Amino acid sequence: MRYSGTDSPILSIKMANSNGIRCAWSNEAFELWYIYHFENRITPMSRNEYAHKITTLVREKQKLKTGKKSTFVYKKNDPEMRSILLGCGCNEQQAIRWAKEQSESFDAQDYHSHNPCTQVYELVELLLGEDKVFNEKIRAIMTKRGCKQ
């Protein structure tokens, strides 16, 4: 099955899945992943609301931690965002649990209706070495090649 670059993201996700490729998509925006560091978001919100919400949540956490007013303003693509989240006491493992629970609450493949939903937690688990399926595949490959583990 071949799709062009003009096909919908849903078809792209289905094509990736059918080829054993997992996608780290979010609906409505990547920033949902950041929101899960603070709260278990189960109701939809507009992508236009994310920056303000993240700014507010980080400021509240920083004020609780330091006792001082925070001047933090969320900036898209900030390479320090993970450090900011962890630095103000956010729990990455809790974010993974909440994102995973919300993702599992949807069962159909009409991904556009999965709102809010993010698969970024799967990428984070992979990067942290916590993806059990991936780890088993790597162990099997290493064993097959005679590599020490």
Question: Predicted segment positions?
Answer:
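C-terminal accessory helical subdomains adjacent to catalytic cores in phosphodiester-
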Residues: 2-149
